[in-house]
Amino acid sequence: MAISSTERRAKNVQIFVEKDAVETSFAKWAQPGHFSRTLAKGPKTTTWIWNLHADAHDFDSQTSSLEEVSRKIFSAHFGQLAVIFLWISGMHFHGAYFSNYSAWLSDPISIKQSSQVVWPIVGQEILNADVGGNFQGVQTTSGWFQMWRAEGITSEVELYWIAIGGLIMSALMLFAGWFHYHKAAPKLEWFQNAESMMNHHLAGLLGLGCLSWSGHQIHIALPINKLLDAGVAPQEIPLPHEFLINRELMAQLYPSFNKGLAPFFSGQWGEYSDFLTFKGGLNPVTGGLWLSDIAHHHLALSVLFIFAGHMYRTNWGIGHSMKEILEAHKGPFTGEGHKGLYEILTTSWHAQLAINLAMMGSLSIIVAHHMYAMPPYPYIATDYATQLSLFTHHMWIGGFCVVGGAAHGAIFMVRDYTPANNYNNLLDRVLRHRDAIISHLNWVCIFLGCHSFGLYIHNDTMRALGRPQDMFSDKAIQLQPIFAQWVQNIHLLAPGTTAPNALATTSYAFGGDVVEVGGKIAMMPIKLGTADFMVHHIHAFTIHVTVLILLKGVLYARSSKLIPDKANLGFRFPCDGPGRGGTCQSSSWDHVFLGLFWMYNSISVVIFHFSWKMQSDVWGTITPDGNISHITGGNFAQSSITINGWLRDFLWSQASQVIQSYGSASSAYGLIFLGAHFIWAFSLMFLFSGRGYWQELIESIVWAHNKLNFAPAIQPRALSITQGRAVGLAHYLLGGIGTTWSFFLARAISIT
């Protein structure tokens, strides 16, 4: 890489910290709304409490100083980490004190996990199911037990110490959040030093993180899991530190430990192949990925990330400059290319957050799919309720993060975008042909919606008329997903060329053998047919509509033909003032509001598809002579090709467990199912009525209070249009997710 003379004179990185930046004042914090001159005056109307919640974390509205905003975000991150460590501590504390972890560890196939016991008050102890191993408790589906097994935890005492460690880390994070805001607050230059941040995050956070994790797996998790797999009782296994300090003990399990570090320094790395493996496939004892493969994977990643963490130029005048990379990134048809993006990403945290949320959301969705296709932890693949829970969980998180990415992209456009600094770069060029983008995307949505839904309407009609031979199905007019089948086949065959020494395929979802653990199917080839082709096009439709709404909100955040001065109205506004009809629901906030409904649609179809497909074609039992019996007997291919089939054979048929749960350990799910339906229906009251109706009602109620001489000091006000939509949306999503959660879990627990 070429180094210019100006780069050679790059000034050394200094430590940019301001001492005693902000006074620690409990008296100030005790005043509600202290961050806003208007809110600090106290409530005059009930709108005050809404504005308090809306603006508490909107640091942009509290100060115009980018440095102050940066410090607040940085400090808030430590608060977030404190909450996460506290949550982790709580999970481990429950595992240590209220769980059947030891019993589960001794027989993970037939004993269910539980880490919560309900107290016998008003008869609610009925929720304590008999999960096996002489334990009654609420069956949990979080996957913690399987993860603890993979980490090499063999007793509740170890969980207890981790819980204490989590508490200490939580307290440390709280202290760090206070210290780096009040005592030693970083200056703006520190936050904007992209190269140093990249080096430290890549080499430190990811590189050393992966290295320490692979170190833990090699020295502690691998030997303990090898003994557990061999049937050694947990209480007979040496304590973790003994594997760390006793090389002889390790060498009994992995002979290459006898050779020490000599093979490492002489380049004979193949000597370590007894614990750094490349087997592929799943461990037949546990149904999870080979732990030695996982250790190898993290070691390789750590090397890559540590290398990557030395790529960027800081004190030593060598390495990449982020600004130069971006400004050099231009082609013959892209104008100024990425010029101006460096300034955007170092002055707008909304722009950076938008990218990070979109990436993390996508990553969460990728994780959801890897969790079942390549189950990472021992015995997780045969715990169907946990598999369904984790898939649903990661899909929801992915959906919310992607929508959040669009939200902050739009906030960036409204608050931080400067057109003069972005002339003819890629962002400007996208904005200038936004009409072409959105109109084409709209056409794609109409095409996908009409055709994918049309296939189902056709099938329902043909089935209703008794003409099965004219339906789109594997037995009549076939619509085979030939490209998906081709991709599956490539992935099945590829390891033969790319990893010739691997023992098995990357994932049995692509093809290969049936992996079973204790007579239950962990993973097997997932055959795709007409039913999958049809529902995948529904996925394409719902995702494209979500993208259409969100992208329109970003691209038209500053202006549109309807509202040319939209940037002046801000991110969130109900309508463009009185006298301008037809301008409501056009703010960027409203696009996020509408996008969330379609995100809900998208994720619902995905998790319904997954739940039914796995029960129909993967999950089930296998006899010693190879006879497979799936939970719903392979009915997905013939039933899911009609809308009636989805309603009758999935929603109604599989809702029987939650509907009939009263009087059983699953009865809480029956109550949640009912309550969540109510919360969902309650949302419609906010979504289908206007502010004026409620204001009139409130004024009549206030009149009655005045008549009786107990009128409130704080004047009641109806929710604003935006507030009403926010409350409606929150209840719609909460009700919908609660309904799906209870429906899935009552069903999954009964089939696990």
Swiss-Prot record:
It is an enzyme of class 1 (oxidoreductase). Pfam families: PsaA_PsaB. P700 is a chlorophyll a/chlorophyll a' dimer, A0 is one or more chlorophyll a, A1 is one or both phylloquinones and FX is a shared 4Fe-4S iron-sulfur center. This is Photosystem I P700 chlorophyll a apoprotein A1. The chain crosses the membrane at residues 73-96, 159-182, 198-222, 294-312, 349-372, 388-414, 436-458, 533-551, 591-612, 666-688, 726-746. Belongs to the PsaA/PsaB family. GO terms for cellular component: chloroplast thylakoid membrane; photosystem I. It is found in: Plastid, Chloroplast thylakoid membrane. Keywords: 4Fe-4S, Chlorophyll, Chloroplast, Chromophore, Electron transport, Iron, Iron-sulfur, Magnesium, Membrane, Metal-binding, Oxidoreductase, Photosynthesis, Photosystem I, Plastid, Thylakoid, Transmembrane, Transmembrane helix, Transport. One of its GO terms (molecular function) is 4 iron, 4 sulfur cluster binding. The PsaA/B heterodimer binds the P700 chlorophyll special pair and subsequent electron acceptors. PSI consists of a core antenna complex that captures photons, and an electron transfer chain that converts photonic excitation into a charge separation. The eukaryotic PSI reaction center is composed of at least 11 subunits. It catalyses: reduced [plastocyanin] + hnu + oxidized [2Fe-2S]-[ferredoxin] = oxidized [plastocyanin] + reduced [2Fe-2S]-[ferredoxin]. Chlorophyll a binds at residues 685, 693. Its EC number is 1.97.1.12. Its main location: plastid. Phylloquinone binds at residue 694.
